[in-house]
């Protein structure tokens, strides 16, 4: 399969298309035919040589993807209600800038109705981060107050939107007066 490889750390010119072996989905994973990938700050930092992939993760950049499920762990997919052929978006540890990638089933979401794959590929990192921390761990409820520090970031903006949608009162900080005004 084709994948984006970092051939030289630094500017985008160090990214080249190369050939890589097809990844294989293991227990609790699925294989996605990638149609869109997000670009995140960690991807840029990795390209510049300042962020190593986690141990065992692909060295191919790309942490957010959208595409079609090709295969996977049938039991894990059934528990998640995911079938072969479904459109999903996923948060992965690396490997998203390729024709295919492997994702943990628990880090996949169905592509929302009306969303293109390009739009869906922008969702996983911010939405998983906010949902996991604010709602799963923090158990935010309607009527409660949530302080969001760094409210002008992608994760901050997502936290504001979700907290308000679920009926919380939101207080926000940002790093500068300019960020607070915009």
Report each predicted region and the residues it spans.
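Short gly/ser/thr-rich secondary-structure transition/capping motifs
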Residues: 12-18, 50-51, 92, 128-133
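Conserved hydrophobic/aromatic beta-strand scaffold that supports enzyme active sites
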Residues: 17-22, 66-68, 100-102, 108
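Cytochrome P450 core scaffold surrounding the K-helix E-X-X-R motif
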Residues: 42-48
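Short beta-strand-to-turn element immediately C-terminal to the catalytic PLP-Schiff-base lysine
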Residues: 6, 47, 70-72, 102-104
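Mid-domain Rossmann-like dinucleotide-binding core that forms the NAD(H)/NADP(H) cofactor-binding site
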Residues: 127-182
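Glycine-rich beta-strand-centered segment in the early N-terminal region that forms part
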Residues: 21-38, 50-95
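Extreme N-terminal starter segment of soluble prokaryotic enzymes
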Residues: 1-2
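NAD(P)H dinucleotide-binding glycine-rich loop of Rossmann-like/cofactor-binding domains
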Residues: 45, 76, 87-150
């Amino acid at each position: 399969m084709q994948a984006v490889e970092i051939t030289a750390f630094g500017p985008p010119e160090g990214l080249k298309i190369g050939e890589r072996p097809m990844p294989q989905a293991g227990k609790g994973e699925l294989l996605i035919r990638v149609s869109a990938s997000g670009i995140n700050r960690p991807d840029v930092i990795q390209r510049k040589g300042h962020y190593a992939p986690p141990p065992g993760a692909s060295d191919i950049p790309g942490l957010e993807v959208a595409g079609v499920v090709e295969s996977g762990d049938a039991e894990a997919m059934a528990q998640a209600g995911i079938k072969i052929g479904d459109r999903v978006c996923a948060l992965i540890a690396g490997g998203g800038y390729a024709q295919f990638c492997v994702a943990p089933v628990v880090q996949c979401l169905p592509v929302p109705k009306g969303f293109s794959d390009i739009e869906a590929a922008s969702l996983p990192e911010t939405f998983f981060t906010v949902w996991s921390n604010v709602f799963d761990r923090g158990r935010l409820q309607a009527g409660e107050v949530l302080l969001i520090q760094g409210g002008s970031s992608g994760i901050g903006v997502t936290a504001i939107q979700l907290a308000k949608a679920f009926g919380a009162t939101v207080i926000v900080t940002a790093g500068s007066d300019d960020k607070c005004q915009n």
